[in-house]
Curated annotation (Swiss-Prot):
GO cellular component terms listed in the entry, alphabetical order: cytosol
Identification of the protein by name: tRNA modification GTPase MnmE
Coiled coil: none
Cofactor note: Binds 1 potassium ion per subunit.
NCBIfam families, per database record: mnmE_trmE_thdF, PRK05291.1-3, small_GTP
Entry's family note: Belongs to the TRAFAC class TrmE-Era-EngA-EngB-Septin-like GTPase superfamily. TrmE GTPase family.
């Protein structure tokens, strides 16, 4: 790995009460000697002036030095905590970069150093970014659990079980003349089924973590004046969209970020769908369809006071244009005017909810439906956060475990069982970074903040 000494601002760019510069690498102590005029004792706070190359004082603050390997990155680390003015931070950063052998850190490079120095695994490194970006208390708590190793521990337990079983299978292959037929005695099958059950549990928890991290994109669609913007306002709990009796009031895409019991929802209100002649409205309708095609779920809003034949036509025309893979929920709005009961039922394979966005009756039915449609389960203790790549790795591991079970129970093919288990181990180890390509590492860490 690179032994460069890197520096970056660890606090957000802009003005604040405190600004922190972080230096990591072999030359961290040399930076302290040149900028502070003093050799620092590890893990001791020092209040000192920060000096320019000509000896003039740039700022004064607290300096902390951590000697490798006892630091976040596993390298020598120096932190300078000064006043948070951006000019001051820039001057101090410029001063440090004048020292030979020091360069500006790439995004996520401090966390990458920590990963490469075995201070944390890849799932924990990703949890740092997730904790910073958490949009709810539950997401933050779950990210912290991942950072503390809860997710990694579950993966490592699975890997250990797979390694144990691989050893057992390969022993059966290497010693075929033993009196006991290890492949047929039932022990390998029992262990394999136990691993499959454990993996299923971790997959379910990871799915919850992915929902908590990434949320669900819900697009509200329908004809003008059906009550789309009113529903957006009701779900958001504020007047996010202008609501009038004039058809076509909403002409552009409106976005709101909300939470339902900790589950993040990206709610998108769109222009009313109709044959428009106004050029601006046409653009809004094109954008509406762009959002519809990228949605996790569509809420088609119908005005329940209109003629049922007309509503059936609206629904059939919309469904004819809708990409087949996108889930659809029918919302019959204005139940307070039509006299419909606020209920949820199934019709022809579609969920239909009658509600009133104006009075908010029946809206809780919609909230519960959105949670259930994503498979989200409220966990008061908090789980761990997971990413799509984690889910994909777990899914691949499950596929190869099932394949291994078939090879064992139907064909007694020990070599093929061992190969499937090797592939399972590889996919699981990708999650923690034990087996990970350099390209994947680059993609992951490049999405981090500069000073992380």
């Amino acid at each position: 790995m690179s032994r460069d000494t890197i520096v970056a601002q660890a606090t957000p760019i802009g003005r604040g009460g405190v600004g922190i510069l972080r230096v990591s690498g072999p030359l961290a102590q040399q930076v302290a000697e040149q900028v502070l005029g003093k050799t620092l004792t590890p893990r001791m706070a020092n209040y000192l002036p920060f000096k320019d190359s000509d000896g003039s004082v740039l700022d004064q603050g607290i300096a902390l030095y951590f000697k490798a390997p006892n630091s976040f990155t596993g390298e020598n680390v120096l932190e300078l905590q000064g006043h948070g003015g951006q000019i001051v931070m820039d001057l101090l950063l410029k001063r440090i970069l004048q020292i030979d052998g020091i360069r500006l850190a790439r995004p996520g490079e401090f966390s990458e150093q920590a990963f490469l120095n075995d201070k944390l695994d890849l799932a924990q490194a990703e949890a740092i970014a997730d904790l910073i970006e958490a949009s709810s208390e539950q997401a933050a708590r779950s990210a912290l659990k991942s950072l503390q190793g809860e997710f990694s521990n579950k993966i490592n337990e699975l890997v250990d079980s797979v390694i144990y079983l691989r050893t057992y299978v390969e022993a059966a292959i290497d010693f075929p003349d033993e009196e006991i037929d290890f492949l047929a005695d039932g022990k390998i099958e029992t262990h394999l089924r136990e691993i499959i059950a454990k993996l299923a549990k971790v997959k379910n928890e990871a799915k919850q973590g992915a929902i908590l991290r990434e949320g669900m994109k819900v697009v509200i669609a329908g004809r003008p004046n059906a009550g789309k913007s009113s529903l957006l306002n009701t779900l958001a709990g504020r007047e996010a969209a202008i609501v009038t009796d004039i058809a076509g009031t909403t002409r552009d895409v409106l976005r709101e970020h909300i939470h339902i019991d900790g589950m993040p929802l990206h709610i998108i209100d769109t222009a009313g769908l109709r044959d428009a002649t106004d050029e601006v409205e046409k653009i809004g309708i094109r954008r509406a369809w762009d959002e519809i095609e990228q949605a996790d779920r569509i809420l088609l809003i119908l005005d329940s006071t209109e003629n049922q034949v007309e509503l059936d036509l609206v629904r059939s025309e919309f469904m004819a244009k809708l990409p087949p893979h996108i889930p659809l929920t029918i919302v019959r709005n204005k139940a307070d005017l039509s006299g419909e009961a606020e209920v949820l039922n199934e019709q022809n394979g579609l969920t239909v909810i009658s509600l009133s966005a104006k009075t908010q009756k029946g809206v809780d039915l919609l909230r519960q439906h959105l949670k259930q449609s994503m498979g989200y389960q409220v966990c008061t203790e908090g789980g761990f956060l997971a990413r799509r790549r984690h889910l994909e790795a777990l899914e691949q591991a499950d596929i190869h475990l099932q394949a291994g079970l078939i090879q064992l129970t139907e064909f007694y093919a020990g070599e093929l069982v061992a190969e499937e288990l090797r592939i399972v181990q590889h996919h699981l180890s990708e999650i923690t970074g034990q087996f990970t390509s350099d390209d994947l590492l680059g993609n992951i860490f490049s999405s981090f903040c500069i000073g992380k």
